[in-house]
């Protein structure tokens, strides 16, 4: 660990796979679930303290963004051994058709001929009289694979959630491997659940195949959750939540609040549940994008849908998420029959 974090460069990006690859339920509530346990093995991605709750479900999520250029998948489940629970989340994201323009420039200078060493030749800048060779345009792809494992350990009777994440990144002909840690906790104060998460603690590092090391800064999240009933409406519960993400790397140029390297972004969400069968969700994530979704659950399986309206002046559009949830016992019974 000392060798990993003792050298290398500090970067602002690298571990976003574990932030935006999430299930449809959390996404539709603006990812503001730091203090809200919503009974899914994916919940430990946002706060590892939730891995203490036993749940025998398998969750599968797929999302496609930017007209199919970016595709991601998430598979989540929990294993119970000797009265201890371990939650696992396996993540994948692929980005295809990334243009590589590095060899396109015909950098021959002002006279239009190579080898004359005139002004502008070989300077790497598109000068007057130079052009790009479209036949030399190439494309490459990026693939990221991640594993997030979470468990709970108590210290002096106070439980802490620990998340260990492993990231493998492949960009064109280069690859990297890294490891990071998250710490989370949950405290109930009267009728409000308060969740705290420290991500990438003490830092998360990636080691590339060329020997370079990229260290990522830690960040901090705090969230609150409250459940309430509406008078006159039976079997209907509303969950309200708010979240605040605090970063120290100045990586969000469009943060809601920023001062130097400090950035603060808020998010909130609502979930209405009727008879634990029908789910109605609204929210806004930390990118100020409106979110919403629906869910329906049967005895052994369910489906969640999320809609994210991207807040972008570039007109990149919106995208959708679908999550399928299955009872693990039901799946095993269908595969192997009752024993």
Q: What function would you assign to each model-found segment?
A:
Residues 4-339:
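Subset of outer-membrane beta-barrel
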